[in-house]
Regions:
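Patatin-like phospholipase
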Residues: 2-88, 96-334
Length: 334
C-alpha cells in the first residue's frame, strides 16, 4: 500500500510542476519557479459524462485547500462528477474549478502565485484591506493572466453552493453560484473566502458577509437537509486535530462589536468545529457519509509561501483519493 501511495504522490507532483534544481536556493526557487499550467484540454473533464447524484462537501482552510485540490483532480480524472458541491472558503474556490472541469487549475494557481503579494499575503492586507487580493485573484488572474472557462462553469451539470457568514444574523448564508461571467454571484464567492480580521466585509443583496468557516466550517447538516442520500466530505485537517479558542478575540470584539451574534459564533467556533469533526467521524464509521482527510497533521499555514509544502499537500490529497477510491465506490454503490 505504501508503494502505491508513493507512486500516486509522485504522479501528482509530476503532473503539476517541473522538477526543480536539487541545490537551488529555496528563496530563489520560490521567486523564480514557473509551474506548468494544467494540461490544455479543448473540453471540460465532465463533457459527455454523467454527473452522479451525490453532495460533495468541501471544508476551507486557505492554502490547506491544496489537499482538497488533489482530491478533486483525482475525482475529475476518474470520472466522478458529484452534481452538487457545497464549499466553504477555500472549499468554494476549489469547488468552482471542479464545476468548470479544469483539472489542475487550483494547484497551478496556488503554486505559481503563492509568492506574489497580490495573491494572498499580509502585504496585500496592508495595501488593500484584504489578505486575499480581490482585484488580482478574482479579476486579473481569471479574466486576463490565467483565463478561466466561464462558459464551462455556466454549462456544467455540477452546481456550487458557496457558504458565507452573515454578520448581522450570526448564521451561515448558503448561496447558489451560477453566474460568474457577469459577476452576479461573484461577491458570494469572494465573501465565502474573506477571512475575518484580514478582509473587508462584503456587502451584497443587503447582507454583510465574511468567511463561511465561522458559522459553518463543515456544512454537513445543510447537505443532509437537501434530502440527498450520499455525501462525500473532504476535510483539511487530520483526525487528531482539535481547534482551540481564538486568541485574537479581544481584537475581534473591537472590530466586530456591532455584530453581537457574529461575535458569539467567533467566540465559540472551536466548540462547534470540534463537535462537527466528531460527528462527521461517527457518521463515516456508520456508513452514513464518506470522509476523505489528511492522514497526518497538516503543516501548511493559511498563507503558506513554501512551494514544496504546497505541492506535497496537493500530492497527499491526490494519493488519499486514490487510496480510498475502492471504498468510496462501495459506499456510492450501496
Amino acid at each position: 500500500m505504501n508503494e502505491t501511495f508513493s507512486a500516486e504522490q509522485h504522479d501528482a507532483r509530476e503532473r503539476v510542476v517541473p522538477a526543480q534544481p536539487e541545490h537551488a536556493d529555496a528563496a530563489k526557487d520560490a521567486e523564480q519557479a514557473n509551474p506548468t499550467p494544467p494540461h490544455a484540454s479543448p473540453e471540460p473533464a465532465w463533457k459527455g459524462k454523467h454527473a452522479t447524484p451525490v453532495n460533495l462537501v468541501l471544508e476551507g482552510g486557505a492554502m490547506r485547500g491544496q489537499f482538497t485540490a488533489g482530491v478533486l483532480d483525482y475525482f475529475l480524472e476518474h470520472n466522478l462528477f458529484c452534481d452538487q458541491v457545497i464549499g466553504v472558503s477555500a472549499g468554494a474556490l476549489n469547488g468552482y474549478c471542479y464545476v468548470s472541469g479544469e483539472v489542475g487549475r487550483t494547484c497551478f494557481l496556488n503554486m505559481k502565485y503563492c509568492n506574489d503579494p497580490r495573491y494572498l499575503s499580509m502585504k496585500s492586507f496592508v495595501h488593500t484591506g484584504n489578505a486575499c487580493g480581490r482585484e488580482f485573484a478574482f479579476h486579473e488572474v481569471p479574466e486576463k493572466l490565467e483565463p478561466f472557462d466561464f462558459q464551462a462553469f455556466t454549462d456544467s451539470p455540477i452546481t456550487l453552493t458557496a457558504v458565507s457568514s452573515d454578520l448581522e444574523l450570526g448564521e451561515a448564508d448558503y448561496h447558489a453560484v451560477r453566474d460568474l461571467g457577469r459577476n452576479a454571484d461573484l461577491p458570494y464567492l469572494i465573501a465565502s473566502s474573506s477571512m475575518p480580521l484580514v478582509s473587508q466585509i462584503v456587502e451584497v443583496d443587503g447582507k454583510k458577509l465574511l468567511d463561511g468557516g465561522t458559522c459553518d466550517s463543515v456544512p454537513i447538516m445543510h447537505s443532509l437537509l437537501t434530502g440527498r442520500k450520499k455525501h462525500i466530505v473532504v476535510l483539511t485537517q487530520d483526525a487528531t486535530y482539535e481547534k482551540g479558542p481564538n486568541k485574537l478575540m479581544p481584537v475581534l470584539t473591537q472590530l466586530y462589536g456591532d455584530f453581537p451574534y457574529y461575535l458569539d459564533r467567533l467566540r465559540y467556533r472551536h466548540v462547534e468545529y470540534n463537535r462537527t469533526y466528531r460527528q462527521v467521524a461517527r457518521m463515516h464509521e456508520a456508513g452514513e457519509l464518506f470522509v476523505i482527510r489528511p492522514q497526518r497533521p497538516v503543516e501548511v499555514r493559511s498563507m503558506e509561501h513554501d512551494q514544496d509544502k504546497l505541492l506535497d499537500l496537493y500530492a497527499q490529497g491526490y494519493a488519499e483519493a486514490a487510496r480510498t477510491w475502492n471504498d468510496l465506490q462501495e459506499y456510492l454503490a450501496k
